[in-house]
């Protein structure tokens, strides 16, 4: 048998490959990493380190989101008085001609999605664009504008670095406003009075509170944290109660839990357990946990990387 990178068991996945183990040793904690790990450690590992080599690429939703994000980053990089409809359309053409999006933009469905997203933004929030002042932060000896702003630090007692990119940071009357674009149709919100669940997801609140806490470490005062959904049926801004002590405690708890569980997995010979969940496609596909859709992969390529002898010999 050729050397395999991973071994799949009914309970989880062992990482065998030394290079992958080294990458896992160096993992840092971001909001998306934390959310994915809490859903299923094995699914997180497979998605991050194995799927890129075996997937049948279907990047439509991700690429559409990046296209819109890139447009907004350039648009809000303009001086406030130049943030007009005409200039937004000009920026959109410039971004679309980038190598990242040029071929993707030729698809009619993608074109229509992009037009709808821009139209929704223009109708809902363009009038505010000329009033918004993009914040400037002094980080690591440099002044940096609050667009796709990289922040890092430590939270709670976690040993690993906490980091991420903030889409947009603007000046409020009494501090900073942390904003994040969400380009899906579904509005996701959280009720802090109810238990975290699939129907009451904490991911987006965790993300914005996580960023607010890192900004506070850098000396910032965060006035507001929010999520902007331009592609929802009605464009909506969801405000996150980032100052709620229970919300902040939950963020710290999640950060520390993932940091601790990652240590335990490494000590346990790089073993990562499966968990059942509606989006845990690997757990469902490989060991029959739940009914999540099958991952879009080349099974022959996956079988070359994975020892599947304990789960029936083949996926």
Region annotations inferred by a language model:
Residues 1-18, 23, 27, 36-38, ...:
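Nuclease-adjacent, charged terminal/linker segments that flank catalytic cores
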Residues 19-26, 42-55, 98, 186-194, ...:
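Short amphipathic alpha-helical segments and their helix-coil junctions
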Residues 67-149:
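A non-catalytic, helix-rich entry segment at domain boundaries
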Residues 140-141, 146-207, 218:
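Non-catalytic protein-protein interaction segments used by genome-maintenance enzymes to assemble
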Residues 205, 212-315:
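Metal-dependent nuclease catalytic regions and adjoining charged, substrate-binding loops involved
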Residues 27-81, 111-115, 148, 284:
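Nuclease catalytic cores
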Residues 50, 72-80, 155, 170, ...:
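Hydrophobic/aromatic-lined pockets within catalytic cores
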Residues 45-51, 182-187, 228-239:
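Short acidic (Asp/Glu) and glycine-rich catalytic loops that position anionic groups and cofactors
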């Amino acid at each position: 048998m050729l050397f395999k990178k991973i071994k799949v068991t009914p309970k989880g996945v062992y990482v065998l490959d030394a290079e992958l183990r080294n990458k896992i040793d160096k993992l840092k904690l971001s909001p998306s990493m934390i959310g994915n790990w809490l859903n299923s450690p094995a699914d997180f590992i497979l998605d991050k380190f194995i799927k890129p080599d075996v997937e049948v690429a279907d990047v439509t939703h991700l690429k559409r989101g990046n296209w819109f994000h890139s447009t907004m980053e350039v648009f809000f990089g303009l001086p406030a008085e130049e943030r007009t409809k005409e200039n937004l359309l000009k920026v959109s053409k410039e971004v679309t001609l980038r190598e990242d999006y040029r071929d993707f933009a030729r698809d009619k469905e993608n074109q229509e999605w992009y037009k709808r997203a821009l139209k929704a933004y223009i109708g809902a929030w363009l009038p505010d664009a000329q009033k918004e002042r993009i914040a400037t932060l002094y980080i690591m000896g440099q002044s940096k504008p609050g667009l796709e702003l990289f922040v890092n630090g430590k939270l709670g007692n976690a040993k690993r670095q906490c980091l991420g990119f903030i889409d947009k940071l603007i000046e409020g009357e009494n501090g900073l406003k942390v904003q994040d674009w969400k380009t899906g149709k579904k509005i996701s919100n959280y009720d802090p009075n109810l238990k975290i669940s699939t129907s009451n997801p904490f991911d987006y609140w965790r993300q914005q509170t996580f960023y607010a806490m890192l900004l506070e470490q850098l000396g910032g005062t965060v006035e507001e944290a929010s999520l902007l959904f331009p592609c929802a049926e009605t464009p909506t801004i969801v405000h996150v109660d980032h100052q709620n002590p229970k919300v902040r405690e939950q963020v710290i708890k999640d950060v520390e839990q993932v940091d601790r569980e990652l240590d335990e997995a490494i000590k346990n010979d790089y073993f990562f357990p499966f968990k059942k969940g509606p989006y845990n496609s690997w757990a469902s596909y490989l060991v029959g946990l739940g009914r999540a859709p099958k991952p879009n992969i080349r099974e022959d390529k996956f079988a070359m990387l994975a020892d599947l002898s304990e789960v029936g010999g083949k996926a």
